[in-house]
Amino acid sequence: MNHPATSGEAPDVNGSGRLSLGDPVVLILSIGFIVAFLALSLYDVTLVADSISKGFAWTALALGSYFQLLLLLTFFIAMGLAITPAAKAKIGNLDAPEMSTFKWLSIILCTLLAGGGVFFAAGEPVYHFIVTPPAFSSEAGTPEAVSNALAQSFMHWGFIGWAVLGSLTAIVLAHAHYVKGQPLQPRTLLYPLLGERLMRGPLGGIIDACCVIAVVAGTVGPIGFLATQVSFGLHEVFGLPNSYTSQLVILAVLASMYVLSAMSGVHKGMQLLSRFNVFLALAVGGVIMLFGPSLFLFNSYLSSMGVYISEFFPMATITAETAPAWWMQWWTVFFFAWFIGFGPLVAIFVARISRGRSIREMIVAVAVLAPIATTVWFTLLGGSGIYYQMTGVIELSEALNNFQFDVATLTVAQALPGGAWMTLAILVLTTIFVATTGDSMSYAIAVVGAGHDDPSPYMRAFWGIAMAIMAAVLLYMGAGQISALQQFIVITAIPVSFILLPSLWDGPKAAYAMAREQGIID
């Protein structure tokens, strides 16, 4: 395994042992953020929530269009690059992949689907069904609204969001690290622009810390919400207590799962969890298609994909000038900023697990196949929710107008074939989705601290435990602080977006450089 050997490399915990937790600037700023957020929340929870809410609203209004443009450009440049001869270049100095295609795709899908697969797949399409999105004029709650509702969900969790997670940025990082010997850190994305002063000085650590903080904010949210969702589900279905103690037990089980998985590495726990989850998701989907409203779901998927494609640009470019500002803030801009916040660290992870794959394989997997799988999953759960809402089996209007997506998920699950058993299966599926995000992000943060792709298992465990503790403290204060932390990722997307920006031109340059080095092009 090729580790970087430049003088700008972050401290190697495995080699020197000088720093057990990696780059001191990244460590101090990232842990400082966690401590400061918790301390300020304990001191004045309302002040913190209100301050984040104001920053969230300003960011969405002032920079929402910029975020949308960044995602669009990333997707189309990546797609253009994928059809060039340079896309034949192999990643990571390996001629053959380290793992099978199924294992590789399973890890990619499970790692990145947690936010959507867990909390929005059942509820978001139903919400857009009962509250017509501004890009459409169909009457809410009618058959004409079905395709539009699903298409809007596809836009939020589809091609352009996924593309920013591991296409152009992953190419830049893979070339810089595995070929040029630069550290596997977000700062490396800016190396072509700022040079050695960035790699050697504290500015590089600040850049890395911004990306770590964004991922912590984005990962702690699902971890905390999972505890509330599973606790609520077990109470509703099996009558178990829905209390803070129950949430702590669920958190402990979840943290044990993803910490042990992260410590065992990509080829052991991480891929085993992902494979199991994919098999379980296929089983759940099979039951829904066999015994649920299968014809409705099949027809809805086809028509919704048609609407998604035909209305792609109107949905992708709608702004607060033509849509209600609150809607843009809480939907399109929120999700796009979420993807941006995760971008650099997920790109590190994708670059690591894609060694031996071609650039074309990586782009197609991340920006095409994974989004298509996501749209299928949203149709299975959300489409079923729409069907049961239309036929009067369930009533989610009040819950969704109050953004109670945990209630929506459980309500839809209980209406599906299998009743309590299906609900239990979806709760298990939900838990493993979050665990696969927890283990991959614990690993990715540790990689940032170490600067290479084999960080100490103890560093991985440290970050996994730190995020679980943060979730536990925030749950003690109330689920509102988890929501506030999730809103904070929109604010962190500001610096992270500028870190991603140079990849629009550096990604193709790196791909062509790799292709020339491998003799694919002249």
Predicted regions and their residues:
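N-terminal alpha-helical transmembrane segments of multi-pass membrane transport
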Residues: N2-A145, M263, G286, L290, ...
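Helix-loop-helix module between adjacent transmembrane segments
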Residues: V13-L42, F75-I77, L113-G117, H156-T228, ...
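Extracellular loop-to-transmembrane helix junctions
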Residues: V25-I31, W58-T74, L105, S147-Y178, ...
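Hydrophobic alpha-helical segments of multi-pass membrane transport proteins
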Residues: F33, Y66-A82, A281-G292, A373-G383, ...
